[in-house]
């Protein structure tokens, strides 16, 4: 229970969920999604990976960093430890969480509509980070990710993933603005 709320844990839970779905093992699916026996199940990861205003940032972030705001992802600390890989890793975590949510959606559980007891929802992440990929500027908002612009979209953090965000949040203006911005080729972009 000491592992950070980051992409490794999300990939692990996604793998457990996938195995449960493929083998039709309802107990394994429940263990992956919401189980007292699994302290890092999908619902716990949604509340732990998605940051909200006032949340305590990872202890590995530099002192004096901009505080996290609603929709940022815990993996943002990779900006300091990567270094300059905060957007890359937050995109990876959002992709893994969204793929997990999509698997659940396809099996009758809508995690795109799920809001954790402490307020976290995937929509906030799509909306927060969409502005970075629309503007292709890592220095916007708090400036926390400043210095990462040159790396954006070069390490698997493709803005095409936001098509999934638009599918589940069609009324989201920030996501729609990214998709319609012409920043990326919708026909050749992939998740």
Regions found by a protein language model. Give the residues of each.
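CBM-like carbohydrate-recognition segments
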Residues: 113-191
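Aromatic-lined, polymer-binding surfaces characteristic
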Residues: 1-109
